[in-house]
Curated annotation (Swiss-Prot):
Organism phylogeny: Eukaryota, Metazoa, Chordata, Craniata, Vertebrata
Additional remark text: Acts as a marker of stem-like cells (CSC) in a number of malignancies. Associated with clinical drug resistance, tumor progression and disease recurrence in malignant melanoma and acute leukemias. Responsible for the resistance to doxorubicin of a subset of malignant melanomas.
Impact upon substituting residue 675 to V: In a colorectal cancer sample; somatic mutation
Family: Belongs to the ABC transporter superfamily. ABCB family. Multidrug resistance exporter (TC 3.A.1.201) subfamily.
Gene Ontology cellular component terms for the protein in this record: apical plasma membrane; plasma membrane
Pfam short name (any one): ABC_tran
Gene3D superfamilies per the UniProt record, alphabetical: ABC transporter type 1, transmembrane domain, P-loop containing nucleotide triphosphate hydrolases
Effect noted on mutating residue 880 to T: In a pancreatic ductal adenocarcinoma sample; somatic mutation
Record keywords: ATP-binding, Cell membrane, Differentiation, Glycoprotein, Membrane, Nucleotide-binding, Repeat, Translocase, Transmembrane, Transmembrane helix, Transport
EC number: 7.6.2.2
Glycosylation sites: 17, 85, 91, 371, 390, 423, 789, 819, 910, 1104, 1188
Catalytic activity: daunorubicin(in) + ATP + H2O = daunorubicin(out) + ADP + phosphate + H(+)
Protein name: ATP-binding cassette sub-family B member 5
Functional description taken from the UniProt entry: Energy-dependent efflux transporter responsible for decreased drug accumulation in multidrug-resistant cells. Specifically present in limbal stem cells, where it plays a key role in corneal development and repair.
Length: 1257
């Protein structure tokens, strides 16, 4: 009944969580335009103001051109065409001297405008890049700080993978949106405003008529922009979910590989990518439709302006000449063009605001327990008296399930108190409340008569040392891991703590001693070694309150007895709280507290509670512990009598070959990234060639618009050489209609670009993410052991590198094609109408090209550096968030924050140089056009005077080349994105071309019809590829007959778990063979081999899905029926628990199984293994996390499961393996003795002493 009540409460909670998650979607999901700059300091505000002013001045340069152009047109047309109405320009009434004077003045105007554009263009871009980098750095820092400051309850209900994606992808989008794009936005606004003012002053009637279409342009841009923001938010959300899956899978890769679940996880990842792809396609279409609508209305405006302008001239309106019409027209054109040019920048800014919404939400979240708080009382010393007063508690993520129900408990200073009870009774909850990871719902927790909520949280936690059941080590050296215990730990203190934790000896055996890297999550250390390093870390804190949560569970008997003694010694003078299933370790405790269903069932010393014959008595009896006689107890195994490891020369021949190879591969890996050309990147889009072709055709069509425009424009100017009003009116109507047609072409071609390139680009992004993730999943484990392939680094590649490849594909190719068509046609038309002038202008073009090349080269370098530093920063962030409980317990938040900041600082140092280069290149390419105009008009005037060119030809050449130059400028703006794309593609190709040594995808190798289960290790030597100087196995030889149960025992680091990994073929031996039924494992098909093996690991990994899906994970080759799932659950003694949950087998287990206790997770892992019905069963400490009742039942289930199977058991608990067919004692990677339990006891050697050390008969 109680189970079903709990179940109903859990169901309500899941429903509540689901609703809560959907709530924000109803609100606006973008921050305000000013709010996005909230992290700007005084200097940033100054830089932004100066940047804005420079943008406004730079923006004013363009509208000044029409004034000069109008003046010149009037001179040319009225002087040459209207008065003489002849094509013999030698006979112009206007004197050559006057024309020379005008052209010289015109040239000086253009040079002046060009100088202003050069100076202010440089200032605006460089200042905005600098301030954006400064603010982005602050946002990254503040976001990470805010996440670390959150209480643990918040982490229970949020997705770590999603947080990592936000930290990389979303903040990158903010950086893009608040940088140089803002400068360009203000420049366009300035051009628009001043252009408008010029137009109104020169001819207000024509300006107002021209402006009548502006509301339509703005309305269409605004509507599309709103749509883009909404779709971007949805797209980012889908990518965040995909990122969460990737993070979960990559951090649990050993489990994924063991159960051959690569394809299943790939599908789960790809499903989220499909959602993102669909939103991405819609976003691209909306963006291009917006652009198409703007250009449609603009061209319509041109037609209207010329038609109405011609009418005003023909009707004799005062002040209106062709020069006036041109000045007004170009002023409005530039204003309108700036609206179009501003749309992409506004869109980038809108995307940044959308991304900032989620980032700022986390930054503004006020935690209920602030890990960085300076408030609260800081007593000079803490005695360690602890009292729980009527404490009730439920986890915030499960508010309806009461874990503690009015707990009252007093612990005196210096006492050792043991908490015992079944799984789920509240033992670990008590420990977490004492650390103030959570606050109780009711009641008080007092330390030295102070409510712990009144104490400063950091100061208080500094007095607590914790050693947990699943110790967390960080991906750095042993030395750093121990020194994380507290600030300013000396080497002497570190070594003393290592000795006390019985870790010193094995550490000194490593070549690098305390500087040995432990690997990601301590992967290079055995369970026992990790546990002892964690104990050393706790002891170095010198805590007043010591919490031991199954602190010796991962240790072998020899280490356990030594560490137990060290812990007992460490407990002296400290308040010690012990959570243990092994009741033999707590008999000497001052007080034993038995918990049941969140309440205190009984308490007292061991003898008292045994006399009561209550719950504690029944727990002790179920463990069947009997005191060995005193003679046996005195025979402890001396660590000094350890057999020395093999002499070095016996393994020299192996080392010399393999270490060299390992070092060579490491060196080559550091330097080799494949060369990536544009063609190689484009080939990635090959399957979408129909979309690319159609998109390209649309781009070519769009590229023809401006060259055609230049011809029509020149025709309109020169048609005033004809005095026939009827002809003029007819021509004006025809040319105006052509402008409208050009507008329709623009709209259709932009829509087609969005439709086809959007699809091609998003499908490519999805495919590349899919391929990259697939390539990662099928690498061998040795690759994941490498430092640079941490989970954080790999998720950064998936999030950032691949998104950047779009900078050289999809719609970017559309822009390049459009610009290439524009430039090509412009040059051809220019040559036809005035080849001399065209030559002059084109001779200047290479300068622009060189500028672009410099910018591209510089940007590629900066992109690579930035990527590398952000990858390192991402690794630190991922590690911190995944192990947040440990970091909070150790109060190491500031240390991780500092490391993260150091990585950001390194990346930030590139910014100033980057700003100078990009600013200079932009300013030069932007201002160069004015200088080209100056030279061109001066030369054009000379050609007209010499009779080698007509004014019409000059206008066509100028307009065509101007649009061609704008196309070059637009292309140069894309250079940085192309650089990033090349850099991202290089990393992607390096990943895709990496061939694993053990290829799980390979179809090669034998697939025997049956697997008997005979195993053999034949002269196996092995070292981990990332530690080639430390041999783990040294010539191991052992035969295991089918159906037999063989147990591996020995001290931590002796090679037990390594043997298990070699059987799974996660690694290959360095020398020797691992044989299955007499066949070398290397000759067998990898997937077939792993399908014959199931493993129950020491630290079970569950996935963020339902219980049924987690059990079905045992066999990923088919859809497993529910009956089979229930059968496996029944065998693992967890079926009745699951049935009591509201959603039964559909209950979600949470991230890393967070909604379940350790024992429940372990039993699910056992069910998962049993479902596979394997021929070979590997049990690596399979019952370590279970309480006594569960252990008995599960042990019985495992004994039953072993029948007819070959079973390899790795354990420290010798009571569990007494019935094994063969017990193998490993020491320093070699077999020291083997036999049955009775035979080894008679030998009275290592095993005999291990048994006695455990005091188990």
């Amino acid at each position: 009944m109680e189970n079903s009540e709990r179940a109903e409460e859990m169901q309500e909670n899941y429903q509540r969580n689901g609703t809560a998650e959907e709530q924000p979607k109803l609100r606006k999901e973008a921050v305000g335009s000013i709010e996005i700059f909230r992290f700007a300091d005084g200097l940033d505000i100054t830089l932004m103001i100066l940047g804005i002013l420079a943008s406004l001045v730079n923006g004013a340069c363009l509208p000044l051109m029409p004034l000069v152009l109008g003046e010149m047109s009037d001179n040319l047309i009225s002087g040459c065409l209207v008065q003489t109405n002849t094509t013999n320009y030698q006979n112009c009434t206007q004197s050559q001297e006057k024309l020379n004077e005008d052209m010289t003045l015109l040239t000086l105007y253009y040079v002046g405008i060009g100088v202003a554009a050069l100076i202010f263009g440089y200032i605006q871009i460089s200042l905005w890049i600098i301030t954006a980098a400064r603010q982005t750095k602050r946002i990254r820092k503040q976001f990470f700080h805010s996440v670390l400051a959150q209480d643990i309850g918040w982490f229970d209900s949020c997705d770590i993978g999603e947080l990592n994606t936000r930290m990389t992808d979303d903040i990158d989008k903010i950086s893009d949106g608040i940088g140089d794009k803002i400068a360009l936005l203000f420049q366009n606004m300035s051009t628009f405003s001043i252009g408008l003012a010029v137009g109104l002053v020169k001819g207000w009637k024509l300006t107002l008529v021209t402006l009548s279409t502006s509301p339509l342009i703005m309305a269409s841009a605004a509507a599309c922009s709103r749509m883009v923001i909404s779709l971007t938010s949805k797209e980012l959300s889908a990518y965040s979910k995909a990122g969460a899956v990737a993070e979960e899978v990559l951090s649990s890769i050993r489990t994924v590989i063991a159960f051959r679940a690569q394809e299943k996880e790939l599908q789960r990842y790809t499903q989220n990518l499909k959602d993102a792809k669909d939103f991405g396609i819609k976003r691209t279409i909306a963006s291009k439709v917006s652009l198409g609508a703007v250009y449609f209305f603009m061209n319509g405006t041109y037609g209207l302006a010329f038609w109405y302008g011609t009418s005003l001239i023909l009707n004799g309106e005062p002040g209106y000449t062709i020069g006036t019409v041109l000045a007004v027209f170009f002023s409005v054109i530039h204003s309108s063009y700036c609206i179009g040019a501003a749309v992409p920048h506004f869109e980038t800014f809108a995307i940044a605001r959308g991304a900032a919404f989620h980032i700022f939400q986390v930054i503004d979240k006020k935690p209920s327990i602030d890990n960085f708080s300076t408030a609260g009382y800081k007593p000079e010393s803490i005695e360690g008296t602890v009292e729980f007063k009527n404490v009730s508690f439920n986890y915030p993520s499960r508010p309806s399930i009461k874990i503690l129900k009015g707990l009252n408990l007093r612990i005196k200073s210096g006492e050792t108190v043991a908490l015992v009870g079944l799984n789920g009774s509240g033992k670990s909850t008590v420990v977490q409340l004492l650390q103030r990871l959570y606050d109780p719902d009711d009641g008080f927790i007092m330390v030295d008569e102070n409510d712990i909520r009144a104490l400063n949280v950091r100061h208080y936690r500094d007095h607590i040392g914790v050693v947990s059941q699943e110790p967390v080590l960080f991906g750095t050296t042993i030395s750093n891991n121990i020194k994380y215990g507290r600030d300013d730990v000396t080497d002497e203190e570190m070594e003393r703590a290592a000795r006390e934790a019985n870790a010193y000896d094995f550490i000194m055996e490593f070549p690098n001693k305390f500087n040995t890297l432990v690997g990601e999550k301590g992967a290079q250390m055995s369970g026992g070694q990790k546990q002892r390093i964690a104990i050393a870390r706790a002891l170095v804190r010198n805590p007043k309150i010591l919490i031991l949560d199954e602190a010796t569970s991962a240790l072998d008997s020899e280490s356990k007895s030594a560490v137990q003694a060290a812990l007992e010694k460490a407990s002296k003078g400290r308040t010690t709280i012990v959570v243990a299933h092994r009741l033999s370790t707590i008999r000497s405790a001052d007080l034993i507290v038995t918990l049941k269903d969140g309440m205190l069932a009984e308490k007292g010393a061991h003898a008292e509670l045994m006399a009561k014959r209550g719950l504690y008595y029944s727990l002790v009896m179920s463990q069947d512990i009997k005191k060995a006689d005193e003679q046996m107890e005195s025979m402890t195994y001396s660590t000094e009598r350890k057999t020395n490891s093999l002499p070095l020369h016996s393994v020299k021949s192996i080392k010399s070959d393999f270490i060299d190879k390992a070092e060579e591969s490491t060196q080559s890996k550091e330097i080799s990234l494949p060369e990536v050309s544009l063609l190689k990147i484009l080939k990635l889009n090959k399957p979408e060639w129909p979309f690319v072709v159609l998109g390209t055709l649309a781009s070519v069509l769009n590229g023809t618009v401006h060259p055609v425009f230049s011809i029509i424009f020149a025709k309109i100017i020169t048609m005033f050489g004809n005095n026939d009003k009827t002809t003029l009116k007819h021509d004006a109507e025809i040319y105006s209609m052509i402008f409208v047609i050009l507008g329709v072409i623009c709209f259709v071609s932009y829509f087609m670009q969005g439709l086809f390139y959007g699809r091609a680009g998003e499908i490519l992004t999805m495919r590349l993410r899919h391929l990259a993730f697939k390539a990662m999943l099928y690498q061998d484990i040795a690759w994941f052991d490498e430092k640079e392939n941490s989970t954080g680094g790999l998720t950064t590649i998936l999030a950032i590198d691949i998104a950047q490849i779009q900078g050289a594909t999809g719609s970017r190719i559309g822009v390049l094609t459009q610009n290439a068509t524009n430039m090509g046609l412009s040059v051809i038309i220019s040559f036809i109408y005035g080849w001399e002038m065209t030559f002059l202008i084109l001779s200047i073009a290479p300068v622009l090209a060189v500028t672009g090349m410099i910018e591209t080269a510089a940007m590629t370098g900066f992109a690579n550096k930035d990527k590398q530093e952000l990858k390192h920063a991402g690794k630190i962030a991922t590690e911190a968030l995944e192990n947040i409980r440990t970091i909070v317990s150790l109060t190491r938040e500031k240390a991780f924050e500092q490391m993260y900041e150091e990585m950001l600082q390194t990346q930030h140092r590139n910014t100033s140089k980057k700003a100078q280069i990009i600013g200079s290149c932009y300013a030069f390419s932007h201002a160069f056009i004015y200088f080209a105009y100056a030279a061109g008009f001066r030369f054009g005037a000379y050609l007209i005077q010499a009779g080698r060119m007509t004014p019409e030809g000059m206008f066509i050449v100028f307009t065509a080349i101007a649009y061609g130059a704008m196309a070059i400028g637009e292309t140069l703006v894309l250079a940085p994105e192309y650089s990033k794309a090349k850099s991202g593609a290089a990393h992607l190709f390096a990943l895709l071309e990496k061939k694993p040594n053990i290829d799980s995808r390979s179809q090669e190798g034998k697939k025997p019809d049956t697997c008997e289960g005979n195993l053999e290790f034949r002269e196996v030597s092995f070292f981990y590829p990332c530690r080639p100087d430390v041999f783990i196995l040294r010539g191991l030889s052992l035969s295991i007959e089918r159906g037999k149960t063989v147990a591996f025992v020995g001290s931590s680091g002796c090679g037990k778990s390594t043997s298990v990994q070699l059987l799974q073929r996660l690694y290959d031996p360095v020398q020797g063979q691992v044989l299955f039924d007499g066949v070398d494992a290397k000759e067998l098909n990898v997937q077939w081999l792993r399908s014959q093996i199931a493993i129950v690991p020491q630290e079970p990994v569950l996935f963020n899905c339902s219980i049924a899906e987690n059990i079905a994970y045992g066999d990923n080759s088919r859809v497993v029926p529910l009956d089979e799932i229930k059968e496996a659950a029944n065998a693992a003694n967890i079926h009745s628990f699951i049935e009591g949950l509201p959603e039964k087998y559909n209950t979600q287990v949470g991230l890393k199984g967070a909604q379940l206790s350790g024992g429940q997770k372990q039993r699910l892992a056992i069910a998962r293994a049993l479902l596979q019905k394997p021929k070979i069963l590997l049990l690596d400490e399979a019952t370590s996390a279970l309480d006594n009742d569960s252990e008995k039942v599960v042990q019985h289930a495992l004994d039953k499961a072993r029948t007819g199977r070959t079973c390899l058991v790795v354990t420290h608990r010798l009571s569990a393996i007494q019935n094994a067919d063969l017990i193998v004692v490993l020491h320093n990677g070699k077999i020291k003795e083997q036999g049955t339990h009775q035979e080894l006891l008679r030998n009275r050697d290592i095993y005999f002493k291990l048994v006695n050390a455990q005091s188990v008969q």
